[in-house]
Amino acid sequence: MDNKQSRTRNFSIIAHIDHGKSTLADRLIQQTGLVSERDMKSQLLDNMDLERERGITIKLQNIRLMYKAKDGNEYYLNLIDTPGHVDFNYEVSRSLAACEGALLVVDAAQGVEAQTLANVYLAIDQDLEILPIINKIDLPSARPEEVKNEIEDLIGLDSSEAPLISAKTGLNIEDVLEDIVKNVPPPKGDNEAPLKALIFDSYYDAYKGVVAYVRVFEGTVKKGMTIKMMNTNKKFEVTEVGVMAPGQTELSELSAGDVGYIAASIKDIRSCRVGDTITDSNNPTEEPLPGYKKATPMVYCGIYPGEGEKYENVRDALEKLQVNDAALEYEAETSAALGFGFRCGFLGLLHMEIMQERLEREFNLDIITTAPSVIYRVTKMDGEVVMIQNPANLPEPSEIKMIEEPIVKGDIIVPKDYVGVVMELCQERRGNMLNMEYIDERRVMLHYDLPLNEVVYDFFDALKSRTRGYGSLDYEVKGYVASTLVKLDILINKEQVDALSFIVHETRAFPRGKAMCEKLKGEIPRHQFAIPIQAAVGNKVIARETISALRKDVLAKCYGGDISRKKKLLEKQKEGKKRMRQIGSVEVPQKAFMSVLKLDE
């Protein structure tokens, strides 16, 4: 092992949302003097505006720090920042595959939360060295000793030596750096072996083509070398290699153990997939690295071009986003109400929202999105089994033998005062309680089976608001269970709007339908004729609202006069409105589609 390799440390930071990952990353960058005070800004690695506004990390980022340790040596620290949100779990697993160690940041006031556990298990799966770090010890409500015990009890990590830090004030950050140097193992790998590098992220650059972020496991990669993608067998000539420090910094080569980027004028987006292995085309390696297991989308929704937007623009934008986000899936579909568009698959509601915002911001697109739905498994009378992503494709009720819906196992951690309200919420959402356990005298972990379509809708928001932000949720899909589900259609002016249809449990059809009709009544502008808005299950209308017509006062010219004259004018107006209703079409604004997504029960 060469000297440089023994002085390299690859690590990432994992934590629950808001426990201070990005702030700690900022402090490490500042402490090592990588960025001048003038250029330093908070959430330095979160370079999307969206990430800054919401205060969350969406994309993993990597950066190389140089640190002169107390033992007199200079170390190369490659930090890979990860998101904390459950929807972005696959982003976390990707960054962990490129590391040897992980810093587990736990908030000294909040303690271990549901997604802390989920991320720790990901790190344990990858055999990483996990270093617990207690953050926010400057808070008056901090209880570092109790939290240390929690980490030991719940996760089984020895945290007696865990650094107690405050990422906000910069207290004890030096301890974290020393901890990394001492406890994270240096990368293994042979510089002379054939090249083997894992693509853990990529993005599209208008000048350089697709730029791949890689972790080199074996061998060396230099400018001018011909590389081969093992998955697609495509070959490219390397135009530039380097590291992020924090901008792209070109180097002569990347060798075993390094984390950096490779540009090779790759114009075709599909030939540089995240999780693929790069090797030397003249001296290829035998086996590719074990890539990532494909992220399976949980939530589907339709994305359609809005007013005056071109279908091709939406397609190109989705293609570019897919390079950067391997979990996004899409296929073309058509809707009677909205024309040509795409059915897109996402990992969860937050993922879906973020993608929509990125399409609107980064590509300046005007898009319409339909209500999210999950994949149902339908067994027909003739024994055929079909998977339904789009409610509009659900077969006729007479053809259906049974419908099954996906069930998730949810782990919810809440303070014990809120156990009652959380149980109530889970019951409302058709949850089935498995068991509950006390983590310590203050907090409880509840295990529930919940239908996924209740979780994707707005469960997360409801949980946060009912527990005043203290509840945390982690879930994984368990399987399919038969259920009595019906398709709820919305008819506007007696015409079905397929984009508003969705599948719902029988018991929830009436309240859901009624709420949707009321919401749409407020959003659709009045027309010259009355518009009925109906919610129907099959042929049976279960709720209705009417938007009254705008009408001209036809009696304005009749001062006094005979009643029959007035009647004649009113009848004439009525006839006109009736004719209008038969031929008139109703404009449904995008706002109406969006408002239906945010129904508060």
Swiss-Prot record:
Coiled-coil region list: none
Topology of this chain in the membrane: Peripheral membrane protein
Positions of GTP binding: 18-23, 135-138
Gene Ontology biological process terms, A to Z: positive regulation of translation
Domain tr-type G: 6-188
Pfam families named among the record's database cross-references: EFG_C, GTP_EFTU, GTP_EFTU_D2, LepA_C
EC number: 3.6.5.n1
Cellular component terms per the entry's GO annotation: plasma membrane
Keyword RNA-binding listed: no
SUPFAM superfamilies xref list: EF-G C-terminal domain-like (SSF54980), P-loop containing nucleoside triphosphate hydrolases (SSF52540), Translation proteins (SSF50447)
Subcellular location per the Swiss-Prot or TrEMBL entry: Cell membrane
Domain of life: Bacteria
InterPro entries xref list: EF-4, EFG_III/V, EFG_V-like, EFTu-like_2, G_TR_CS, LepA_C_sf, LepA_CTD, LepA_IV
CDD domains referenced in this protein's UniProt entry, alphabetically: EF4_II (cd03699), EF4_III (cd16260), LepA (cd01890), lepA_C (cd03709)
Chemical reaction(s) catalysed: GTP + H2O = GDP + phosphate + H(+)
GO terms, molecular function: GTP binding; GTPase activity; ribosome binding; translation elongation factor activity
Signal peptide: none
Record key words, sorted: Cell membrane, GTP-binding, Hydrolase, Membrane, Nucleotide-binding, Protein biosynthesis
Function: Required for accurate and efficient protein synthesis under certain stress conditions. May act as a fidelity factor of the translation reaction, by catalyzing a one-codon backward translocation of tRNAs on improperly translocated ribosomes. Back-translocation proceeds from a post-translocation (POST) complex to a pre-translocation (PRE) complex, thus giving elongation factor G a second chance to translocate the tRNAs correctly. Binds to ribosomes in a GTP-dependent manner.
PANTHER family: TRANSLATION FACTOR GUF1 HOMOLOG, CHLOROPLASTIC (PTHR43512:SF4), TRANSLATION FACTOR GUF1-RELATED (PTHR43512)
Protein family membership: Belongs to the TRAFAC class translation factor GTPase superfamily. Classic translation factor GTPase family. LepA subfamily.
Protein name: Elongation factor 4
The species this protein was found in: Clostridioides difficile (strain 630) (Peptoclostridium difficile)
Gene: lepA
